[in-house]
């Protein structure tokens, strides 16, 4: 009987744990190595919004449609401890200094917010609580035999011919593997020191989580909001099944600190976000703020993720750069990576558009 493949997954975000889950379900032995905390970066702080067909004119379309279905399946199979729910989604706008016109059709929204149309129905849009989703998938993977190890990936173990056969942790420990996957979100760019990989950048986003109880119905909102200064923000507001409401705005290109624990907000960003929330919603103005948070989403030069083999290096794989759709696309990425590593090719989605070799590799110096 052949021995189960040992697969080292660098990074315990949604992408890493989804790969661990699908590999473990197939009888492999994945080990997730995480520096800070599972779901401790964007995968625990993001919006968790899912859309079936919002990538229809992009190379992401097939991945996204597959993933939307897998989210429903995973919630059903694993008891939905992450509040997966379908909901309608609307778009609109507001101007900070517009006089409030009295309550509109939605009493929880200020009268100055104009809803301009429906962007999605419960058939096409859904939501998960991302921290619970990422933790839940990690636990499900562990139930199938996956391991979680705390450690900082500091290098790779190579055979004389160049094949990757493990990782080196800070402190010197070696962890052997039949396959190594770089899934460290924006920190994946560190792996370009060891592998021919393109740059992965980080875009910072700020968000607040309010305890809104029953005051906000199950409707997601995408707004354009003009501040008194004239600057336009594009807030997204997602009411969750657990009685909280997540809202974000203010994305900035900032250097990513080496240690994910050191991610900090831009000066003044939370105050600006809180002022906006008071302005658009009396329900938010009255609700306690449970969490103020900032995180980086991973982005490549052309906006598409890197999913597949590292070109020219046996045993090395990459899965990162999912930008604004990492929570949505985690399941189909996990499934495809498990197929690629265990069967030699992905069957459900074509990974060709996501090949790392399409972009120029960083100079390892
Ligand atoms: C504000 C905001 C809102 C978003 N909203 C949505 C949304 O509504 N829907 C959606 O689909 N997507 C959304 N996204 C995008 C989504 O959150 C990301 O694409 C996704 O979380 C990326 O997951 P990841 O696993 O690649 O990276 P991460 O979540 O960043 O995980 C990477 C992990 O690697 C670890 N790591 C780093 N360095 C090392 C090292 N040296 N050794 C070991 N481990 C290391 C980190 O600690 C981290 O846990 C949003 C993103 C942001 C910023």
Give the location of each predicted region.
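C-terminal catalytic lobe of FAD-dependent flavoproteins
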Residues: 279-365
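Predominantly flavin-linked oxidoreductase catalytic cores and closely associated redox partners
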Residues: 128-217
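Residue-level detector of alpha-helix initiation sites
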Residues: 13-14, 37, 324
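Active-site substrate-recognition segment that forms the wall
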Residues: 21-22, 48-50, 82-85, 186-312
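Flavin (FAD/FMN) cofactor-binding and adjacent substrate-gating region
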Residues: 73-151, 155-163, 168, 299
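N-terminal Rossmann-like FAD-binding beta1-loop-alpha1 element of flavoenzymes
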Residues: 5-31
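Conserved FAD-binding subdomain of flavin-dependent enzymes
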Residues: 22-25, 35-89, 96-107, 228-230
């Amino acid at each position: 009987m052949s021995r189960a493949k040992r697969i080292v997954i660098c990074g315990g975000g949604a992408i890493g744990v989804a790969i661990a889950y699908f590999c473990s379900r197939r009888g492999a032995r994945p080990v997730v190595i995480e520096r800070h905390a599972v779901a401790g970066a964007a995968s625990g702080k993001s919006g968790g919004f899912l859309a079936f067909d919002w990538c229809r004119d992009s190379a992401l379309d097939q991945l996204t449609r597959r993933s939307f279905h897998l989210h429903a399946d995973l919630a059903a199979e694993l008891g939905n401890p992450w509040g997966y729910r379908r909901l309608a989604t609307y778009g609109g706008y507001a101007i900070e200094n517009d006089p409030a016109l009295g309550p509109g059709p939605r009493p929880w929204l200020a009268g100055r917010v104009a809803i301009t149309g429906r962007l999605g129905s419960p058939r096409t849009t859904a939501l998960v609580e991302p921290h619970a989703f990422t933790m839940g998938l990690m636990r499900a993977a562990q139930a199938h035999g996956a391991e979680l190890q705390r450690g900082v990936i500091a290098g790779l173990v190579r055979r004389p011919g160049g094949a990757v056969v493990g990782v080196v942790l800070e402190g010197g420990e070696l962890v052997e593997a039949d396959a190594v996957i770089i899934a460290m979100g924006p920190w994946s760019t560190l792996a370009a020191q060891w592998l021919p990989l393109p740059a992965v950048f980080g875009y910072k986003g700020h968000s607040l989580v309010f305890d809104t109880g029953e005051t906000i119905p199950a409707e997601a909102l995408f707004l354009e909001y003009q501040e008194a200064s004239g600057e336009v923000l594009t807030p997204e507001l997602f009411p969750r099944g657990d009685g909280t409401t997540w809202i974000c705005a203010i994305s900035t290109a900032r250097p990513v600190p080496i240690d994910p624990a050191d991610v900090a907000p831009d000066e003044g960003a939370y105050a600006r976000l809180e002022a906006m929330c008071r302005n658009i919603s009396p329900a938010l103005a009255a609700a306690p703020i449970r969490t103020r948070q900032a995180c980086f989403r991973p982005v490549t030069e052309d906006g598409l993720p890197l999913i597949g083999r590292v070109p020219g290096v046996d045993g090395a794989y990459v899965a990162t750069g999912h930008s604004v759709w990492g929570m949505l696309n985690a399941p189909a990425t996990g499934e495809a990576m498990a197929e690629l590593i265990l069967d030699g090719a992905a069957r459900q989605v074509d990974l060709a558009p996501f090949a790392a070799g399409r972009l120029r590799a960083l100079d390892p110096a």
